[in-house]
Amino acid sequence: MAEITAKLVKELREKSGAGVMDAKKALVETDGDIEKAIELLREKGMAKAAKKADRVAAEGLTGVYVNGNVAAVIEVNAETDFVAKNAQFVELVNTTAKVIAEGKPANNEESLALIMPSGETLEAAYVSATATIGEKISFRRFALIEKTDAQHFGAYQHNGGRIGVISVVEGGDEALAKQLSMHIAAMKPTVLSYKELDEQFVKDELAQLNHVIDQDNESRAMVNKPALPHLKYGSKAQLTDDVIAQAEADIKAELAAEGKPEKIWDKIIPGKMDRFMLDNTKVDQAYTLLAQVYIMDDSKTVEAYLESVNASVVEFARFEVGEGIEKAANDFEAEVAATMAAALNN
């Protein structure tokens, strides 16, 4: 039987990423054959990964990488926040973002076939990571954005990499694009414009806003405060020419009832119409980038600010770790019971 030296164990660990004991056991089982030991570790790793496949991985990091006129933002998940801070995990995320940006896959299936610097496919690299790190590690999603030479990328990560943003700006400069990405990270828009919102979605969100107003009015009634009116509209998509004309007519009637002279109406009406638009586009403000108040200049919307500096936003992508993943509630008593049962059965 071949002697299993510390040098041999170290060599296997460097090639496989396995722990000391796992590497030593593999060498013992393969009589010191490095290549067979690597294959054995890979098989064991796949078995370990398969056992973890059904676990929920909702922690992790985003990765952002810019490669010339192509940028990628990705999300990689782990089971715990602790592992998400692991140096091996962070390196895996950053490497994956680079491979995605350079490989430009069309979908997740294509991305899994890309070759990592280790020579493994991306899919195999994640199986290996699951085995060596000891938690389910999964590549969840990516977005690729391309720009022209005249446009600018804004790349930004927030909260230790839990949020990743890429934006493309025409006009302006890279600093403006980064500021815009910071806004996107903070304000969570999901689409660029009201034109991208589904009609039924707007109706549902408007109903929810009015439900909140109803709850607020119950509290106001208890302290004899006047009730707040319901919102009639939630999006610019609902503000037809007829609706806007009626709003202006209502404002004029209000000014006449207040006895305001007609010669000053032209100075008052624009401000009141701006207020009408603001009050009746609450859904747009929550979900569309252009309608949001710009965090770098709260006197303007994003759209108005960009117009003031002769710039426009072309596209953006925002990932936040765990979005849409339902986390399993941990039942501590059940977990302890299962652990004790397993121990008794061994």
From Swiss-Prot:
HAMAP family: EF_Ts. PROSITE patterns: EF_TS_1, EF_TS_2. This is Elongation factor Ts. Its main location: cytoplasm. Residues 80-83 are annotated as: Involved in Mg(2+) ion dislocation from EF-Tu. Signal peptide: none annotated. The gene is tsf. InterPro entries: EF-Ts_dimer_sf (IPR036402), Transl_elong_EFTs/EF1B (IPR001816), Transl_elong_EFTs/EF1B_dimer (IPR014039), Transl_elong_Ts_CS (IPR018101), UBA-like_sf (IPR009060). It is found in: Cytoplasm. Associates with the EF-Tu.GDP complex and induces the exchange of GDP to GTP. It remains bound to the aminoacyl-tRNA.EF-Tu.GTP complex up to the GTP hydrolysis stage on the ribosome. The keyword Lipid biosynthesis does not apply. Belongs to the EF-Ts family. One of its GO terms (cellular component) is cytoplasm. It holds the Pfam family EF_TS. The keyword Protein biosynthesis applies. Keywords: Cytoplasm, Elongation factor, Protein biosynthesis. One of its GO terms (molecular function) is translation elongation factor activity. It comes from Streptococcus pneumoniae serotype 19F (strain G54). It comes from the Bacteria. PANTHER family: ELONGATION FACTOR TS (PTHR11741), ELONGATION FACTOR TS, MITOCHONDRIAL (PTHR11741:SF0).
